C-alpha cells in the first residue's frame, strides 16, 4: 500500500527551540499507526504539524503526494485531515445528538449530512441509544466514542488522535481502541499518540518510537510489543533515560 502521509526531515518547535529535530515518517493508507515515546519527545507536536496548528521550520509534510506545509488548518480539514485533541471537545450541556450534528456544520447538502450521520450512528450505536442525553452525563469512554462518531460526520481520510485513552479505565480503553479499529474498516487512516504504549501498539498496524524529537524505530505494532528493549523502556518495566536510547 502506498503512503498517504509522508513527513520528511521535519524540524518544528516554538521560538528558538526545536521540539522535532528531523522527523521522518511514512503512514500507509488504511492503517493505524501509533507514536510512542517519553513525555516531551514531540509526539503531540507531530500531530500539530500535520493538522496545521504548527508550521514546520524545515522539512515537508505531504498528504496524498501534495505538500501541505503552507495550508491552513481549515484547508487541511477540507482535504480530509481531522485532528481530535487530547482534551475532550464535546459540549457537555448539549445532547449527544446535537454534538454529533456539530460535525456537519459545514455541510449544506442535507441528504449528504443524513448519510454521514447514519454511518456514524451505525459505527457508534451509543449515538442512537443515548442520543437525547447530555454529553456531560456520559463516562469518559462513552464521550470518546461520541467524539469519534462526530469525526466520521466530517468524512475524514486521515484522523489524528492525541491520547485517545487518557483518563479511561481498562474496560473503556479497550472499547475505545476497538472503535478506532472500526474507523479503518472503511478505509480511513489513523495516526495516534498514546502514552499507554501497550494498548496503543496492540490496536495498531504500525508503531513508531519517538525520542528527543527524532523517530528512532518504526516497526509493526506486534513486533514492538515483543521487542525486549521497547518493553523495558515503554511497556511498564522502566522509564527511558538519555543513556538508554532505543536502537533499530
Show the residue positions of the predicted features.
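Conserved ABC ATPase signature
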Residues: 134-138, 142
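Conserved ABC transporter NBD signature motif
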Residues: 59-67, 79, 113-117, 219
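Conserved catalytic motifs of ABC-family nucleotide-binding domains
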Residues: 155
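The feature captures the beta-strand-to-loop junction immediately N-terminal to the Walker
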Residues: 36-38
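Helix-to-loop junction immediately C-terminal to a conserved catalytic motif
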Residues: 51
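ABC ATPase C-loop
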Residues: 151-152
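Catalytic Walker B motif of ABC-type/P-loop ATPase nucleotide-binding domains
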Residues: 159-163
